[in-house]
């Protein structure tokens, strides 16, 4: 089935739209959560398949997303991080839902807005990278205050930077001479440390900074732990990720109901815990060539689906 409809491509092009709608197993009178509202593309599609009793609750911590709020009585916008999903749904009187969707990572708007500092091309921008401008931690503060070991772990885990240790050590040394303030200044200062393709290298470094600043993996874990209590039996959760670490977290949680694959231990030996989900996608769904031609940024997207038992 083709669910593609108009959204706000100037803000964000929804990725794997048809696949996400199919994965949610939409029910006309159902209650659904869009954890990453953004440009409203996914929420708009969900609403198109609901009747007057259906509801969509859209979360987004980025204040810029408010401009895209849908004028529909069946839609409620919640301007907060999805890590607080249960708390804010309960404030709206919602204790159980039929489906949850999350399109992780940075939006096209955030990436393309030069003042936000997400892109390596925004060289005049300050080192900000906050998805939620209400928080205090920025990329600038990370680079200028984190210790060498913490920086190394960040670049290695979140960016898979090959020379993470060397980079971290250099940053601590160089910032004592001149603190990092802008994208251009940071790139110029570490230019001699680049390994391989410069564009790819800086993209990996900036990805690591962004994930750290916004605690993206922490937020994902917190949200996932609340899902079993929120989803109705037979309800679906659909997660679209763009980073291997995020995908591993989602895969593990869908399969085991926790973030470690090891069996729990009791005094008499090990025993497997009972997962609250049935995994629908044994392998992740990836974009078609047609979608990639239309939206090259979707290339690393992976979609996984699980159903509440």
Question: For each predicted feature, which ranges?
Answer:
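S-adenosyl-L-methionine-dependent methyltransferase catalytic core, i.e., the SAM/SAH-binding region
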Residues: 1-309
């Amino acid at each position: 089935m083709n669910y593609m409809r108009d959204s706000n491509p100037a803000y964000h092009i929804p990725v794997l739209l048809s696949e996400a709608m199919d994965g949610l197993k939409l029910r006309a009178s159902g209650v659904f959560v869009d954890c990453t509202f953004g440009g409203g593309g996914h929420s708009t599609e969900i609403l198109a398949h609901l009747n007057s009793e259906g509801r969509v609750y859209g979360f987004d911590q980025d204040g810029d997303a408010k401009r895209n709020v849908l004028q529909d009585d069946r839609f409620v916008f919640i301007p907060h991080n999805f890590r607080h999903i249960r708390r804010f749904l309960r404030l709206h009187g919602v204790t159980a839902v039929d489906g949850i969707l999350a399109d992780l990572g940075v939006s096209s708007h955030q990436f393309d807005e030069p003042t936000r500092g997400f892109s390596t091309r925004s060289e005049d921008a300050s080192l900000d990278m906050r998805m939620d401008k209400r928080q205090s931690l920025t990329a600038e503060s990370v680079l200028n205050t984190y210790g060498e070991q913490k920086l190394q772990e960040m670049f290695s885990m979140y960016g898979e930077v090959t020379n993470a240790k060397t980079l971290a050590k250099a940053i601590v040394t160089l910032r004592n001479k001149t603190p990092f303030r802008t994208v251009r200044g940071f790139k110029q200062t570490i230019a001699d440390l680049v390994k391989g393709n410069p564009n790819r290298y800086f993209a990996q470094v900036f990805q690591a900074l962004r994930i750290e600043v916004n605690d993206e993996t922490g937020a994902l874990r917190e949200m996932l732990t609340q899902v079993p209590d929120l989803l109705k039996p037979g309800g679906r959760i659909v997660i679209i990720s763009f980073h291997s670490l995020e995908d591993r977290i989602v895969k593990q949680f869908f399969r085991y109901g926790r973030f470690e694959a090891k069996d729990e231990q009791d005094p008499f030996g090990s025993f497997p815990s009972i997962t609250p989900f049935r995994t629908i996608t044994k392998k992740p769904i990836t974009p078609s060539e047609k979608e990639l031609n239309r939206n090259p940024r979707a290339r690393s997207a992976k979609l996984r689906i699980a159903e509440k038992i």
